[in-house]
């Protein structure tokens, strides 16, 4: 008989519209100018999971210009807590890679501003600027370099190939 590995976690998310420019009177408008609050949290009950806890909250301004109803602007705060054993592993991996081996903070914070710009054909450009506090080497554990607090900028370009090639409805 083989072993069966099971992990358990809980994830909760929610969104609440705080304000609509039309006061909710324009029911036929599928994209009203609105401000929404969103949040989510997750907890891993299994102590072997590297990310033990993650929680975020943000505000989203949707359809700020009715001429571009699919655009949005947002701000978000994210808090992530690593498992204590995993932070020790990261420090040990840093040491054997020639780094200081100093302990990493279990808590990481990200402060973010973001946007979503809808382009023709269902394509979307999503720029983001983040400020990172207490970064760790989660994605590159065997490095001698230590991450520093600071800014990050980037973007995602979403291209719906199926739609553009006519394989999926637009």
Task: Enumerate the predicted regions with their spans.
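Outer-membrane beta-barrel translocator domains and adjoining extracellular loop/strand segments
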Residues: 1, 26, 49-53, 85-92, ...
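Residues that define the transmembrane beta-barrel architecture of outer-membrane proteins
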Residues: 4-12, 33, 51-55, 105-111, ...
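Transmembrane beta-strands of outer-membrane beta-barrel pores
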Residues: 18, 41-47, 61, 77-83, ...
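Short loop/turn motifs that connect adjacent beta-strands in outer-membrane beta-barrel proteins
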Residues: 19-35, 63-73, 119-125, 162-170
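Transmembrane beta-barrel strands of outer-membrane/channel proteins
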Residues: 35-43, 55-57, 73-81, 91, ...
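Outer-membrane beta-barrel "beta-signal"
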Residues: 75, 147-170
């Amino acid at each position: 008989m083989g072993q069966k590995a099971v992990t358990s976690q809980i994830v909760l998310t929610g969104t609440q519209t705080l304000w609509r420019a039309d006061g909710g009177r324009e029911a036929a408008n599928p994209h009203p100018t609105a401000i929404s609050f969103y949040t989510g949290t997750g907890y891993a009950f299994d102590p072997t999971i590297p990310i033990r806890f993650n929680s975020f909250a943000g505000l989203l301004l949707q359809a700020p210009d009715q001429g571009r109803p699919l655009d949005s602007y947002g701000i978000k705060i994210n808090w992530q807590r690593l498992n204590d054993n995993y932070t020790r592993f990261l420090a040990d991996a840093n040491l054997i890679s020639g780094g200081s081996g100093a302990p990493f903070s279990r808590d990481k914070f990200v402060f973010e501003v973001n946007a979503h710009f809808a382009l023709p054909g269902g394509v979307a450009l999503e720029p983001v600027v983040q400020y990172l506090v207490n970064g760790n080497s989660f994605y590159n554990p065997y490095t001698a370099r230590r991450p520093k607090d600071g800014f990050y900028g980037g973007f995602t370009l979403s291209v719906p190939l199926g739609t553009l090639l006519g394989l999926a409805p637009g």
